[in-house]
Amino acid sequence: MNAPEVPSPPPSEPPAGGPAAAAAAPGEPARRGSPKARAMTRAAVRHAAPFLLWIGAMLAGQLFHLVPSSATEEAASVDLLSDAGLYAVQTALCLGALLLLRPWRHHPGAFRPAHVLPALAVGAAVFALWALPGAEFWQGLLPWDGGRDLAKAAAEAEARYAPAATGWPLFAVHLLGTGVAIAFAEEFFWRAYLLRAVRTPDFLDIPVGAFHAPSFLAVAAVFAAEHGSLAVPGFLAGLAYGILFVRTRDVWAACLAHAATNLALGAYVLATGHWEFW
């Protein structure tokens, strides 16, 4: 009498995520050169490159204006190499990198309509905070002669960026750059990437929006430093966008809030002439 056949076990399925996940499970540090390490590097580039291109183009433009040569003076009269023209180049590089690299591929299904109103509220609050130093009643309360400095900065910025100086097409490109390109690039860099990357290079192993006080405050501080003389409102803005990101766990909510702030500032400077914020 033949023994009954014992069914063989079903073949094991590969782990979700493909070979990279098989090489290193979530939470396990990736070995240098491993598939997981390469995947993390690609994700880091997708999050950081648009913002870094923006900063690089901005620094190159500033360096261009510092070169004391007759060639530079002649080139400054060319529209493409004016401040507004250089800003258009920044915008094209940043927006092109965003569309090419698509960092949102690492945040599938993150946006929820319920986050629209909180994001717009945060954006409006940050706008009010940002624009407050330019208000006349606030200038009278400053313990230093801030009003004169603001007026000087406004006059210099108006000469570079106002539609009367640049034309409406370049002004519209500037609005696109500040209201969409850099707003989105900054949130994918500061909140979606750096908040986690300062804790581990394997940043995708950390859940989106996970709160970690030291990294949260550090990122807000560096975000503030990026904004130079407006570091104080910059720090508070970094806290506001960061809190929204942590509470919603949605990078799109932070992007929308940042875009709302910048677009409101664009409308504000056009209506009031406070070009120092532009």
Residue ranges and their predicted role:
Residues 34-50, 210-211:
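N-terminal membrane topogenic signal
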Residues 74-80, 107-183, 199-208, 275:
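Juxtamembrane helix-loop-helix connectors linking adjacent transmembrane helices
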Residues 66-71, 102-107, 135-139, 143, ...:
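Transmembrane helix-loop junctions in multipass membrane proteins, especially transporters and channels
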Residues 43-104, 110-123:
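Alpha-helical transmembrane segments in multi-pass membrane proteins
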